[in-house]
Amino acid sequence: MDADAILKKDQRRSSLKQRNLLLSMRLNQTTATNGAPPQARVQPGKGYRNPGKVLSPIRNQEMSPGKRPTLEISELKNVSPINQAHKTGKARAGGVPLSKLQNLKLADFEIGKVLGKGKFGRVYCVRHIESGFVCALKAMEKKDIIQYNIEKQFRREVEIQSSLRHPNLTQLYGYFHDEKRVYLLMEYLVNGELYKHLKGRSHFNDVVASYYVYQMADALDYMHERNILHRDIKPENIIIGFNNTIKLTDFGWSVITPKGSKRKTLCGTVDYLSPELIRSREYNEKVDVWALGVLTYELLVGSPPFEEESKELTYKRILKRNLIFPDHVDTEARHLISRLLEYDPGDRIPLKEVKKHPWIEKNKPFW
């Protein structure tokens, strides 16, 4: 049975069987994350973060008639933590030896519900039939990877994510492929996107928000020490696990930047762009620090600080650094946000200082 038939067959399961499957998945799972690609979110009448407001260097290229898509998966060498763990014999996932996950194919998995849909594929909750190991499986069409000219970006995403080991970064276990698709195996988190939780309560209190900001600062500090920029921080790309642990996901725009060098590519989400990105100037890891400031504001207020009806108006507010705080925002939280959102990248607060900021310290005992 080919991959298409397997996916279609599993998606025709009854809702009762789906619920039973997902229940058993939760009982078997000890650590989790979903890695689902972010969904564009829309506010009535505002077109909030609609696809038109998401920037990326992707170009929609037409393929030559009769040209057969070929994706050199073999170029992804030594990037699978599964293979590395198998060699050392030390790593395990959810109590299951990772050697169980060698030489995989789609038929080795039970396919659960769709966790997310993106431009280049879908993410499913799956269970490895033999071991019972539960994870998220991202299925991407090879023809789409080639058509949209993202082979380099795809390889970079896999190589970067597979090299990261941090409690607040989603882990990529490995990948496999067949004739039509590439499949990425990632952690599964049962609690879903941070944005969905934020939307359900309008904003978080200081205790919860400070804990999330601390974790993100630690994760970004870890990445920056390894010369890696994320470049797409936002609530849709953060997943919640057990005990309010959060994990940054979606490394599609991440890039390795040697110490002292800068980037020029414009990418990210409009509301989270820093002034230097908007002005098309060279930038470094401080764009992530700015984005953390926007995230902190959004966690406490419920919307980004510079949000406007159009991209152009949002740009103007960002460049003017027109920062307005509602009355309920704590004074020390305002100070931290202002330090993160300094116009000059060199003036932005270092991430190590973020973790020791008075707003963080006074809320830490209540985590």
UniProtKB/Swiss-Prot annotation:
It is an enzyme of class 2 (transferase). The active site is at residue 232. Residues 30-49 are annotated as: Disordered. GO terms for cellular component: chromosome passenger complex; cytoplasm; kinetochore; nucleus; spindle microtubule; spindle midzone; spindle pole. It catalyses: L-seryl-[protein] + ATP = O-phospho-L-seryl-[protein] + ADP + H(+); L-threonyl-[protein] + ATP = O-phospho-L-threonyl-[protein] + ADP + H(+). Its main location: nucleus. It is found in: Nucleus; Cytoplasm, Cytoskeleton, Spindle; Chromosome, Centromere, Kinetochore. The keyword tRNA processing does not apply. PANTHER family: SERINE/THREONINE-PROTEIN KINASE IAL-RELATED. Component of the chromosomal passenger complex (CPC), a complex that acts as a key regulator of chromosome segregation and cytokinesis. Has a role in error-correction of aberrent kinetochore-microtubule attachments to ensure that sister kinetochores become bioriented and connect to opposite poles by promoting spindle assembly checkpoint signaling. This is Aurora kinase.
